[in-house]
Amino acid sequence: MRRLNRKKTLSLVKELDAFPKVPESYVETSASGGTVSLIAFTTMALLTIMEFSVYQDTWMKYEYEVDKDFSSKLRINIDITVAMKCQYVGADVLDLAETMVASADGLVYEPAVFDLSPQQKEWQRMLQLTQSRLQEEHSLQDVIFKSAFKSASTALPPREDDSSQSPDACRIHGHLYVNKVAGNFHITVGKAIPHPRGHAHLAALVNHESYNFSHRIDHLSFGELVPAIINPLDGTEKIAIDHNQMFQYFITVVPTKLHTYKISADTHQFSVTERERIINHAAGSHGVSGIFMKYDLSSLMVTVTEEHMPFWQFFVRLCGIVGGIFSTTGMLHGIGKFIVEIICCRFRLGSYKPVNSVPFEDGHTDNHLPLLENNTH
């Protein structure tokens, strides 16, 4: 009884077979079919290689949410060279809460030579070229995010020559921690001193003819310092054409959380608008000579996550490629063969075999016998 039930079960399973086997003796091969098969296998191989390269690649996913962190401090990373001696300039930050952050809290004043060496000029040229490409091709920013901590540092390389020229500039570099409110980082004449109504700079002690706010921004970023990330103002160089010249940068800072397979960092992106003008009180152009970077923080936070195609999706796409090519090439081969047979007059519903002679009862023969099924009487 068990054997009978087992046979019935096997018979039922065989009837459900969706892949019936055709005996090889019933299969007819042809040159056209072999050619189509070669084309199909070649196409499948190429598409499989391309699909595998897509599977190995990653992409960046952007998500937006409201920034709810108001209590933490904002870090400003600075590396600026000004074409004035260090004793003549001062840098500090003053925010909307009238909180002053002095440069002594984290900035270093280092005498330097404003003109770059040949190697440094080449570095600056490449950085400016990269900046121009980033402004045209925004998708390159994803490549920069993925290459963080893997690419070479974007910092200005040290001078390779021992220049005998005396320092004529001041390199101000380091970092400051400020409140997460709008503020103004500025470099102007004279050291800053606090007073009840804000702060002031001792500009009266500096000769007006020594004013020169030509400057080069080697690096400016907000948040955690991430090597190999190129920021909008990196490599910027401005040459002053007048002693009383003001350079203004209006910066909008966007908090950014970066999560890749290599790093995870809380940093900030920013956009900038530049403006420069000559101070002339007689002409109505009021202000103070110097470099002013006015920043404001966006209320939105961006989360950038590196993602990868899951294996199951890669497998499904691969099956789709193989099955689709087999079905499509088989259908196209059948249609093509059908058309060729019609054009060449080889398509026929039956088989025609001519009969040389058919004898009649009276002894005559007729060589023109009409077509009969199987040519039989």
From Swiss-Prot:
Q: Single Gene Ontology BP term? A: retrograde vesicle-mediated transport, Golgi to endoplasmic reticulum
Spell out the InterPro entries in the cross-references. Answer: Erv, Erv_C, Erv_N
The residues on the Lumenal side of the membrane are 55-319
Pfam families, A to Z: COPIIcoated_ERV, ERGIC_N
Its annotated compartments are: Endoplasmic reticulum-Golgi intermediate compartment membrane; Golgi apparatus, cis-Golgi network membrane; Endoplasmic reticulum membrane; Cytoplasm
Keywords (A to Z) from UniProt: Cytoplasm, Endoplasmic reticulum, ER-Golgi transport, Golgi apparatus, Membrane, Nucleus, Transmembrane, Transmembrane helix, Transport
Look up the signal peptide feature and give its range.
none
Q: Where are the transmembrane segments?
A: 34-54, 320-340
Q: List residues in topological domain: Cytoplasmic.
A: 1-33, 341-377
User: Quick one: a GO cellular component term?
Assistant: nucleus
* Major localization class: endoplasmic reticulum
Membrane protein topology class = Multi-pass membrane protein
Q: Which family does it belong to?
A: Belongs to the ERGIC family.
Q: What does this protein do?
A: Possible role in transport between endoplasmic reticulum and Golgi.
Question: Subunit comment for this entry?
Answer: May form a heteromeric complex composed of ERGIC1, ERGIC2 and ERGIC3. Interacts with ERGIC3, the interaction is required for the stable expression of both proteins. May interact with EEF1A1.
| Name of the molecule in the record | Endoplasmic reticulum-Golgi intermediate compartment protein 2
